[in-house]
């Protein structure tokens, strides 16, 4: 059972018990600020649809227009990519001013979208709302205070920490990544009875039992050669071209390197030019088969994003975390390394050494995979669906 839950705990935990009643129409409300939040939302959407429910996923900023979504999402991503230290200072400032007793500038900004969101909800007939992002939770909290919101709201945390300003929201439940996170969230003023340590949701394909031989065949990789996976992420990986060059220089005996560049076309093109003469380095752009590539590889290098790290841990691939973006990623890598789920290093040389250590030491890989199994919940998405179903049942029963 996930995270040490025993049967009697499950029976008494309102975050888990429940069951399917009528089919629901669910709104998943996110924002275009990095792919982690969206990936969590898509995971819940897929689980809802597999259970026979209707689910719509909406970028809240789009309700104000494409320009608003592009400006806010673009500004966030550019700040993280090109000025991570400034982002870290902003994050620290948020930690310094956070309080459950007063509203932050972030709340004041997000309440400006309340009228647009109200108009949208008035046109639709959603039974319940889930949000994997703080910003919609802020807007929904303002709407709730104004009496504009009839739906129950489930918030989903996508990092292994309570990021600033969750404490000023008023959602009905908060899905958090691990039972050990409960005390931190409570310390910031979140009600204990509203915290559900169900884990970060990932798509069901990541929970499929690994078959490396089949995965390597699908990916066109040699069946008998060790393979590294390098995930550049939607918001960058530092000096990935230098990292990849150094890793390829140190690889031996036909070891394979797969580099996934995501939607960054410029990076994909540059790296294909960089390695076009090296048949052991495979550079990809966007792919919808990340789970298969994880399955095909022996070790992954990735930034410590909460969602991408959870995907790798659920897939049970040994992880080397590269230097975090200051803020929540620092907390993510601290959680993973303290639980034996990854190795975290800040310099390229140490990161590559850590990857080579994991590649050569089977006992270390086995130990890390065991820690990953013990600290993740592959069925988080479905358990969130059960929670949403229970909320709808309660609303129907009280109406």
Regions found by a protein language model. Give the residues of each.
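Active-site and donor-binding regions of nucleotide-sugar-utilizing enzymes
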Residues: 35, 92-189, 194-198, 203
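Conserved N-terminal ligand/cofactor-binding loop architecture of enzyme catalytic domains
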Residues: 43-118, 122-123
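A nucleotide-sugar donor-handling region in carbohydrate enzymes
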Residues: 172-227, 231-234, 266-267
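Donor-nucleotide binding loops and adjacent catalytic segments primarily
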Residues: 221-297
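Acidic donor-binding loop of glycosyltransferase active sites
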Residues: 295-305
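C-terminal "capping" alpha-helix adjacent to the active site of nucleotide-linked donor transferases
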Residues: 338-343, 347-363
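A short, well-ordered alpha-helix in the C-terminal region of glycosyltransferases
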Residues: 364-378
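C-terminal alpha-helical cap of glycosyltransferases
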Residues: 377-399
